[in-house]
């Protein structure tokens, strides 16, 4: 993998501060994090222990996690940091009715960096607004999961030698799958040949994300059967149907187990160099008989979370300076004019569960493609927190 980065000139261009959404990251920033991860892997274990010595990393996980939580904590400890972990929610002050906002304010005073996972969309964005300490999003509802995306890209680059011009199929829960949303966005920087979105209609990619792909000139196809693209793709990105995201359990029962891959329907039917990725945990969508095939990279993918998350933590804490030829600068805000006094129509948005002022960003349409008389009607806005795009006539006034 070392040779893959020889042409990348590192200049510390990553904005030190927060890593919340792939929508905020430029191509160069992504590549810098991947390169730093590779450089960290090359360091001795003894040297790594000095990188974050004396730092306290707070891991606030408000929903269940095994890989992501343990990966962040292992990554931090291997860099010499101490861990301050939120106890199970039922044992914390959250159970007593403490707001998310107050929790972040308190934890900020105890730590140097906050890693947060939350079931509500936009929670990490809100945390980054409240905290003067850096925040890393470890997954917010069905919105974003940047650390998973960066380790996905690291794995793809390591295996394929490039991130450019690839064909990828996303299969399973694409509606609620934050890993899919994040990775699809990140890949727009790397000119994918085509993206295939394979899911039942009820679990297809949200329309606002498809519109973003169109805006970026990305070719994609909507499918319901992965066999329609299996012999064409470089990457098979499998996801589980997420029972916990369904408002009605009856809807989950209709689609559970709809996609299952195994030796019989994969081996001999795909490209010889195709790779299978999965953010894990799996349930029954990948049978174990695929685990020892050359296509299965999901366990290696999970292992790659250590150097990538180390890179992320060092970056937001400004501890990446010795790897770059100039200092980075702390940046914790953007100069954007927000529209206020409106209510987000996403019931899972953090703004509908905390006492905060909601902010929207006006999305400017291409006036050449719109009837001037309909400009006002067609106006679109993006919620600052959950990043959902909604039409003007769907907005409610606070």
What spans do the regions from the language model cover?
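Positively charged, low-complexity intrinsically disordered leader regions
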Residues: 2-70, 74
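Cys/His-rich microdomains that often coordinate metals
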Residues: 348-353, 390
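Short, flexible, mixed-charge glycine/proline-rich loop motifs
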Residues: 329-341, 360-378
């Amino acid at each position: 993998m070392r040779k893959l980065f020889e042409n990348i000139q590192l200049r510390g261009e990553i904005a030190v501060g927060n890593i919340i959404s792939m929508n905020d990251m430029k191509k160069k920033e992504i590549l810098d994090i991947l390169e730093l991860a590779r450089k960290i892997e090359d360091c001795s274990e003894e040297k790594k222990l000095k990188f974050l010595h004396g730092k306290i990393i707070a891991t606030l996980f408000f929903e269940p996690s095994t890989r992501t939580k343990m990966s962040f904590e292992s990554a931090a400890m291997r860099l010499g940091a101490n861990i301050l972990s939120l106890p199970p929610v039922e044992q914390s002050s959250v159970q007593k009715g403490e707001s998310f906002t107050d929790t972040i304010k308190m934890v900020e005073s105890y730590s140097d960096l906050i890693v947060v996972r939350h079931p509500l969309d936009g929670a990490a964005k809100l945390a980054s607004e409240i905290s003067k300490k850096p925040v890393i999003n470890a997954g917010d509802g069905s919105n974003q999961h940047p650390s998973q995306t960066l380790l996905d890209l690291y794995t793809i680059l390591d295996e394929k030698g490039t991130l450019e011009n690839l064909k990828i199929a996303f299969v399973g829960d694409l509606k609620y799958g934050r890993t899919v949303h994040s990775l699809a966005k990140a890949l727009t920087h790397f000119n994918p040949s085509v993206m295939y979105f394979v899911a039942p209609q009820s679990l297809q990619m949200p329309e606002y994300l498809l519109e973003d792909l169109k805006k970026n000139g990305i070719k994609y196809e909507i499918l319901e059967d992965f066999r329609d693209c299996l012999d064409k793709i470089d990457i098979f990105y499998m996801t589980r149907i997420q029972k916990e995201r369904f408002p009605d359990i009856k809807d989950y029962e209709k689609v559970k187990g709809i996609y299952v891959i195994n030796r019989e329907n994969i081996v001999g039917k795909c490209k010889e160099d195709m790779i299978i990725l999965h953010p894990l945990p799996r349930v029954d969508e990948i049978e174990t008989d695929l685990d020892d095939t050359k296509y299965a990279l999901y366990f290696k993918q999970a292992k790659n979370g250590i150097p990538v998350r180390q890179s992320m933590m060092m970056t937001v804490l400004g501890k990446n300076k010795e790897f770059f030829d100039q200092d980075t600068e702390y940046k914790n805000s953007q100069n954007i004019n927000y529209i206020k006094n409106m209510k987000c129509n996403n019931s899972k948005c953090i703004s509908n569960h905390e006492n905060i002022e909601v902010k929207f960003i006006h999305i400017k349409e291409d006036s050449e493609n719109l009837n001037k008389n309909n400009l006002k009607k067609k106006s679109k806005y993006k919620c600052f927190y959950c990043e959902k795009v909604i039409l003007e006539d769907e907005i409610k006034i606070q």
